[in-house]
Amino acid sequence: MAGVWKVLVVLVGLAVVACAIPHRRLRYEEVVAQALQFYNEGQQGQPLFRLLEATPPPSLNSKSRIPLNFRIKETVCIFTLDRQPGNCAFREGGEERICRGAFVRRRRVRALTLRCDRDQRRQPEFPRVTRPAGPTA
């Protein structure tokens, strides 16, 4: 019976210590890297995207919710399970996207919301062709 009590005390002690240890804060760069990896996994058969710049929030007070804001650009590599975008060159004239979202961590649950839209300011402009409205001779 004494052995059972010792095991129970050890288990309770371990549970208290596990609850008392704070979650390690993820660095903003780590969260952005995870978000980009998640985004690229949805690009099967499409070009991978690589990080151009990340804009961390002015202050990161929350351990549980991290707002995301970063830009990515298309690379010359196509998605495969083992390909890392960091090893791929940017595609000349490649599409750029602005990504916004949030990373939320509550106890053992992690959630990522992410939306990456084309950066309209960075798209190449094509010359406009004007034609006369009337019939041509």
Curated annotation (Swiss-Prot):
Tissue localization of expression: Large granules of neutrophils.
Molecular function (GO) terms for this protein are: cysteine-type endopeptidase inhibitor activity
Key words of the record: Antibiotic, Antimicrobial, Disulfide bond, Secreted, Signal
Gene Ontology CC entries for this record = extracellular space
Q: Where in the cell is it found?
A: Secreted
Annotated Gene3D superfamilies: 3.10.450.10
**Entry's Gene Ontology BP terms:** defense response to bacterium
The principal location of this protein is secreted
The task this protein performs is described as:
Binds to bacterial lipopolysaccharides (LPS), potentiates weakly the early antibacterial effects of BPI. Inhibits the late lethal action of BPI.
UniProt record similarity statement: Belongs to the cathelicidin family.
Quote the protein name from its UniProt record.
Answer: 15 kDa protein B
Natural source organism: Oryctolagus cuniculus
